[in-house]
């Protein structure tokens, strides 16, 4: 077990145990018109954590004429791919994933810095001081239960992280591998810090119940939805809520705390269309309209933490 998680202790980050919901205000102040976009062309290739961002990228295309191609990939996969590509990235923009992977990419010299005036409005802890990455939101983590399978197996619903170590869940828990998933890397960090000296004992007990460590962040959602496993440790966002509605699943917000992790945005060094990618970062963060659109797509309000001055978004803290 310790071998699985040992590499996760290289970076120590503090993650609060709380969760953010999403709500937009009815009254919004339109943005001031932005400066004319620079002369851009071609296609911007994006690696993202999901395939739901089409409307946002369509808006960028409408403003700039730059077409966008998007590939879904976890942050750990992106980092491994970057290193394998040896300084010649196949994509231009990195959109989403745990911020620890972005920090590692910066240290490895794989990112291109981006600076723009509106960055001053972002919280210092949610951006790199040299502009190598910015946070676009916050991901929270909870549990996803297959109601039919839980009933069939006679399982009681877990309410806390400690509950997951109960022997009744042996062989019925799925979790994305923290060595690949930036979000679950953050979960490990947060729980180790919260539990102190008992942290490794906790993960030894949890490991006894986990039947499968997925390679993708979406594996818990997919495998719980299909009935392969009863319990998934998963990020919680709009796609999870939709899956819960469509597949008779229950989302559980752990009573003993919900780890959360900032999600990154960055431009790859030596990217083929680096100008378009750098402008996209400025385009996104310089416009409250674009950030509100992103919040609506993700059904998250965490951008309010990152950019407190944004109007039209109300931060909601979930406890159940």
Predicted features along the sequence, with ranges:
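Short amphipathic alpha-helical coupling segments at ligand-binding clamshell hinges
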Residues: 56, 202, 263, 272-284, ...
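Short, low-complexity disordered leader/linker segments with a strong preference
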Residues: 1-44
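Short, polar/charged alpha-helical segment
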Residues: 47-69, 83, 143, 242-243
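Periplasmic-binding protein-like
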Residues: 168-176, 202-207, 213-214, 246-269, 284-317
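A ligand-binding cleft/hinge motif common to bilobed small-molecule-binding domains
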Residues: 100-104, 225, 230-248
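A bilobed periplasmic-binding-protein/Venus flytrap-type ligand-binding module shared by bacterial periplasmic
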Residues: 144-149, 189-192, 261-273, 293-296
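Extracytoplasmic ligand-binding site segments that recognize negatively charged/polar headgroups
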Residues: 47-54, 73-77, 89-228
């Amino acid at each position: 077990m310790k071998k699985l998680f040992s590499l996760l202790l290289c970076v120590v980050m503090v993650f609060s145990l709380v969760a953010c919901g999403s709500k937009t205000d009815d009254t919004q102040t339109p943005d001031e018109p932005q400066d004319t976009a620079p002369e851009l062309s071609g296609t911007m290739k994006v690696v993202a954590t999901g395939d739901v961002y089409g409307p946002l990228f369509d808006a960028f295309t409408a403003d700039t004429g730059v077409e966008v191609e998007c590939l879904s990939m976890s942050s750990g996969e992106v980092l491994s791919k970057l290193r394998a590509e040896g300084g010649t990235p196949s994509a231009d923009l990195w959109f989403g994933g745990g911020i620890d992977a972005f920090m590692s990419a910066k240290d490895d010299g794989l990112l291109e810095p981006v600076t723009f005036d509106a960055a001053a409005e972002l919280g210092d802890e949610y951006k790199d001081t040299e502009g190598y990455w910015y946070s676009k939101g916050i991901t929270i983590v909870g549990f996803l239960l297959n109601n039919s399978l839980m009933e069939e197996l006679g399982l009681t619903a877990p309410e806390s992280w400690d509950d997951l170590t109960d022997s009744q869940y042996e062989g019925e828990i799925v979790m994305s591998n923290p060595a690949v998933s930036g979000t679950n890397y953050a979960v490990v960090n947060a729980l180790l810090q919260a539990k102190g000296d008992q942290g490794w004992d906790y993960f030894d007990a949890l490991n006894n119940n986990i039947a499968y460590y997925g390679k993708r962040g979406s594996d818990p959602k997919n495998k719980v939805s299909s009935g392969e496993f009863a319990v998934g440790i998963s990020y919680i966002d709009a796609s999870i809520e939709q899956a819960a509605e469509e597949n008779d699943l229950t989302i559980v917000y752990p009573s003993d705390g919900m780890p959360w992790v900032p999600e990154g945005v960055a431009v790859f060094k030596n990217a083929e269309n680096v100008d378009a990618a750098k402008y996209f970062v400025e385009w996104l963060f310089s416009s409250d309209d674009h950030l509100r659109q992103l919040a609506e797509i993700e059904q998250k309000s965490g951008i309010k933490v990152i950019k407190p001055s944004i109007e039209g978004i109300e931060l909601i803290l979930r406890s159940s």
